[in-house]
Regions:
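Cell-envelope and extracellular/periplasmic
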Residues: 12-16, 45-46
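Structural motif
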Residues: 15-27
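Alpha-helical cap/lid subdomain in secreted, periplasmic
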Residues: 27-190
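Serine-esterase "nucleophile elbow" of acetyl-processing enzymes
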Residues: 1-13, 30-34
């Protein structure tokens, strides 16, 4: 029986969005060398773009200077404020739906262009689309639907460039990953990662 040997290197960073991927990860010489040697490249980017936008939207709607450490913290503040003013939920949905996707798309294109230029001939690229990271959080259903619409639009951007950059999209949006998250309710646990 022939043995198959492999090496896995994980460059993931908590909180990293698409701009951070381009500015911090894909400028690192070690990462670039690793990408150039890899037979298979897995990419998961985008959820933090959404979560950061959510935090900014809540900050704007609540008219606060509070720097939320997480989307969960921002949503908790929104929930508490919405208890006295339910119209705040509608404001956040409206704000999220007006999000300008152009920056995410520009970052995505830049990232894929860089990786495409670094990878060796014949290397596979597999990207995950975005699941609903707030599905397990206690938020109003109308807001959850607004978040899902934003995610669908982001996933369309990811899928739009698959052929151009030769990558496959692993559909985690339709998976049960939301059933397997860490205590923060956002990030997949070990089972969710698998």
């Amino acid at each position: 029986e022939e043995e198959f040997q492999y090496e896995i290197t994980n460059y993931a960073r908590n909180g990293l969005d698409s701009a951070g991927m381009n500015d911090k990860i894909l400028t690192d010489e070690e990462v670039c060398d690793s990408v150039g040697r890899s037979d298979v490249i897995f990419i998961t980017v985008g959820s933090n773009d959404l979560l950061n936008e959510c935090k900014s939207a809540v900050q704007e709607i609540l008219d606060t200077d509070t720097k939320f450490k997480s989307a969960g913290e921002a949503l908790k503040a929104l929930r508490e404020s919405a208890a006295g003013n339910p119209l705040l939920v509608l404001k956040i949905i409206e704000t999220l739906e007006q999000w300008d996707y152009q920056m995410f798309e520009a970052n995505w294109i830049e990232m894929m262009h860089r990786i495409d230029g670094m990878k060796k001939e014949g290397a596979w690229i597999i990207v995950t689309n975005i699941y609903n990271p707030v599905a397990n959080l206690d938020i109003p259903s109308t807001m959850d639907r607004g978040v899902e619409n934003v995610i669908r639009n982001m996933n369309q951007i990811i899928e739009k460039y698959a052929e151009e950059y030769g990558y496959q999209v692993a559909d985690i949006f339709s998976s049960e990953v939301c059933d397997h998250v860490q205590p923060d309710g956002l990030h997949p646990d070990q089972t969710g990662q698998q």
